[in-house]
Amino acid sequence: MAQDIKIMNLTKSSLEALNRNQMLSKKSSRKILKICMYAILTFAMCGVVLICLTAMSNSDGSLTQSGSHNQSGSLKGLSSTPGDGEILNKAEIETLRFIFSNYPHGNRDPTGDDVEKPADAALPNEEDQKVKIADAGKHIKLMKQYNEIVADMSEDNKEQLAKMLRELLKKKINERKKKREDPNGNNEEGKEVINISVPSFNYKRVSANQDDSDDEEEVSVAQIEGLFVNLKYASKFFNFMNKYKRSYKDINEQMEKYKNFKMNYLKIKKHNETNQMYKMKVNQFSDYSKKDFESYFRKLLPIPDHLKKKYVVPFSSMNNGKGKNVVTSSSGANLLADVPEILDYREKGIVHEPKDQGLCGSCWAFASVGNVECMYAKEHNKTILTLSEQEVVDCSKLNFGCDGGHPFYSFIYAIENGICMGDDYKYKAMDNLFCLNYRCKNKVTLSSVGGVKENELIRALNEVGPVSVNVGVTDDFSFYGGGIFNGTCTEELNHSVLLVGYGQVQSSKIFQEKNAYDDASGVTKKGALSYPSKADDGIQYYWIIKNSWSKFWGENGFMRISRNKEGDNVFCGIGVEVFYPIL
């Protein structure tokens, strides 16, 4: 037995191949499981619909009789409070209706003539009158802030804001109750007070526990200002929800996402106040938690050695067309002797505008398919085709669809099968159960795959064209909004992008020249932002990468990311795994 084990060739590549076979079998099992689940869900839904139709036909009369009672007791659109199963009571509904319907249109002083006063009310003394005037001025100022926040809100957003406001207040009340409890578990004041306050309107609800006293707790201006801080961030959150079409399953998830958004928003704001190399901005990742980022960015698949030997043609730099490899020094000086300082394939008209992979983990498909599009345009007089990422997601058996993959395996699929036109096989941002490449009328095929080492990147870009690279992404990378990224990365490669060029710029001109690519005109913008020159104003070197997070991310869908002069420092992993298609 020992002799048999020695004979077996358990090399690293063999183990990786064995691991891949196991992963492929799991993928097949998952597809079978999905089919079974869809079948079960279909039968279940049919049964539910049948039951509902039967129940509706039997209860038409009872629903008609009870309709008037339901309308008087609740407000449509306001969901139940999470956890207690109770609808908002009538007083709370009227309060929220007043705040989000009447208040924004009002501009009244709470001390005005429309405030009802007792007939026998005592005349205020001079000191009380001054305090009231000061409070009224503060209230008017806060009222203007409120109007600015909710001016552009739709009715749905105001309704959602009401829900969130209630949850925030409820949370603060629970915290206050815990602070007031003595060691024996008794409340010191024996009551719970909910304050919903805006200028010109104070609402107080007192819920007595043991004490039947109707004493009310006055609302301070500081409490009102704290409320407006929450309104400000909530307003930004709802703008984010509308822009990126976010919808959450319930108020609990919405509150959790709001918490993530506020934390990320403050991080972005703090970063932009200090960093001079790159800026962050709110984007589709702004409601992500650390756990969400870890789930979205998964480690790319490994490549066994035997597949590299079978398919990869190592890049061989040509020296003056003589077909000899360039001999490079440790500094890379000879390698870069005759290359330009700046190269941008967007300006050469062969780079498609960035697409959007959505919530599907298919970055590897977009990087590889985009690479094929560039190479085809380079060799066919700048004819840019739109090829199908969805075909590669569904049909490449060596990849795992939305669960991850690698550009290298996409190139292998293109060698063996070709890649379909995008119009024939449109992107769905999800795994189809079956490969549907029978739809394809025309395809682009490859002959082989090229491989590049980290110290050959600059020359390969000049001689070959754009190449596919893998990077280690963090939340810093995800929030990129412009400039030259030099933030934190991971050693684990978890995202694929397309490298389309490189450049250099003085530090003081990062946001002034060559800053953001204008996809409408096909030229670089100038003069967007500028910072004062520094005494030690050095040169900043960068790569230009095309991402797959839509043209609204980063600099119109692209990123400038830091590098050293030779381009071999593998910052963020650029240079560790580099491949390109050979037509």
Swiss-Prot record:
Main location (coarse class): membrane
Transmembrane segment boundaries: 35-55
Family annotation (CDD domains): Peptidase_C1A
Cytoplasmic side, ranges: 1-34
One of the Pfam families matching this protein, by short name: Inhibitor_I29
Entry superkingdom: Eukaryota
Full protein name: Vivapain-1
GO function term, MF aspect, one: cysteine-type peptidase activity
Family statement drawn from the similarity comment of this UniProt entry: Belongs to the peptidase C1 family.
Keywords tagged on the record: Disulfide bond, Glycoprotein, Hydrolase, Membrane, Protease, Signal-anchor, Thiol protease, Transmembrane, Transmembrane helix, Zymogen
Intrachain disulfide bonds: C360-C402, C395-C435, C420-C440, C489-C572
GO cellular component: membrane
Ranges of biased composition (kind: Basic and acidic residues): 106-119
Listed Gene3D superfamilies: Cysteine proteinases
Source organism of the structure: Plasmodium vivax (strain Salvador I)
